Amino acid sequence: MNKKRPNGKSHSTRPVRSGAPKWVRFTREEVELLVEELAKKGYSPSMIGIILRDQYGIPLVKQITGKKLTKILEEKGLAPKIPEDLFNLIRKAANVRRHLFEHPKDKRAKKGLEEIESKIRRLADYYKRIGKLPKEWKYEPEKAELLASGAAS
């Protein structure tokens, strides 16, 4: 079954570049230390990328270090247990479920929850296949409430 809506195409394209830009003054080791410090402060991988871009002038970690940001976090043992995109979907589903508890006749929200949970299952299957999630991992809405509330990230 196809997705209900196609993904948007409106965004800027990254320039094709093999190495780090000339104007970046950080070395590979300095960038890895910055990533580690920000992760220890509790920032998510996407937030770390935004902070590095906006405050330190580092456009892409991979151009400087040769490794993706999540790979650096995995090497340091700071990677999240559940991939960030899956965790965000779980949190979104928990919020919609909470809304439905207060407004049980909201049919649009019910349909939206079905779509979100379908997306969670598809993404979980992918992460199980590539080995980022254990094979026995299963999405359960009750446990998702605990995850989304910040019990584990």
From Swiss-Prot:
CDD domains: Ribosomal_S15p_S13e. GO terms for biological process: translation. GO terms for cellular component: cytosolic small ribosomal subunit. PROSITE patterns: RIBOSOMAL_S15 (PS00362). Residues 1-14 have a biased composition (Basic residues). Keywords: Ribonucleoprotein, Ribosomal protein. It comes from the Archaea. The keyword Ribosomal protein applies. Residues 1-20 are annotated as: Disordered. InterPro entries: Ribosomal_uS15, Ribosomal_uS15_arc_euk, Ribosomal_uS15_N, uS15_NS1_RNA-bd_sf. GO terms for molecular function: small ribosomal subunit rRNA binding; structural constituent of ribosome. NCBIfam families: PRK08561.1. Belongs to the universal ribosomal protein uS15 family. Part of the 30S ribosomal subunit. This is Small ribosomal subunit protein uS15. It comes from Sulfurisphaera tokodaii (strain DSM 16993 / JCM 10545 / NBRC 100140 / 7) (Sulfolobus tokodaii). The lineage of its organism: Archaea, Thermoproteota, Thermoprotei, Sulfolobales, Sulfolobaceae. The gene is rps15.
